[in-house]
């Protein structure tokens, strides 16, 4: 195995300037921001932007293994600015080639692209501000970039570690949020990966998601085929709102509930996608946001990028399934959680994913389509497909896959009511 590489360098990125933060305190007790408090003291607010673009130098930290390459920008909130799939030679999160802020964030400036980490509320107050960082090497050849800060509104501390391991085609993210105060504090955590929009985009929600909510659960729609009115759009003819091209206005939707640990997006015109994996018991939030496939959405595209086109926000919530919704930290309490972001290819719309593998099993005009994509090495495994209630397997083959590779096929001439697909090895079932 090749050890993970980590390095620091200055990178030059075309950047649009902002005005200065207001030096005067703003006691905005009655300000409402995205359904929650807009009070930001002791932070200052920036309310001016510039059309002046310069080539600006930014501190970047890179992680790279045999499968993916990731760039983190500590000077912009510690966000993942770029994530590159080395196997498919594609950005598996939306890469904005310019830093072009708009007044979207809690303190004003906010940029699209990459993976943003929203806390203690969204959009993160320090999303356009620097954070501390350090590097950690592991005995197994893995490398971690830690970023962290103490935010000033609630006095909470956060540390987030971005880890690549030599034998895994996934970015592992481990976070710790600590309340060092003598009284309870509240916070939320929504990771916000951006993915490419356009005609080829389709969101990949788990198969048990049949309904989605708006913010505050104030409106509901069937999913993926909407059949009523949602965001004042008439979908009564039956419209697949998992497709970017079918959503004409700015729209949020969040899964009502799911027993699955994944959510993602598939790009039909690139044969590649992104998946997020986390324990659904603590990470139930699964959301899509779009500016809409219309002139209004195109205007926002131009406000946030020069040439990279539309994007989708595919937000993933910890301790919350809707926005705004908060969890509590008791005095001196710490909460920890893990998330995984990974590229995949070949399988298209998938039905399950874990930290080690991605599964496809669906009916189509071709028959029963099945597939398996490896995130970690799958050697000495078997893949079995069975009809529930019957002993004989419809498929039972040996599997030997290296990370970032896939196998797939079609079962013809059968029409079972319910099927199971299970990869397993000497150590048991895949996690």
Where would I find each of the regions flagged by the language model?
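Short, aromatic- and glycine-rich surface loops/edge beta-strands on solvent-exposed regions
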Residues: 383-384, 412-430
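Asparagine-centered strand-capping/turn motif at beta-strand->loop junctions
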Residues: 176-183, 372-374
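A contiguous, surface-exposed recognition patch within enzymatic or periplasmic domains that forms
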Residues: 2-5, 9-26, 61, 68-71, ...
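Short, hydrophobic/aromatic beta-strand segments
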Residues: 183-189, 350-351, 380-384
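Beta-strand-rich binding/interaction modules
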Residues: 367-397, 419-421
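Surface beta-strand/loop "capping" patches
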Residues: 347-378
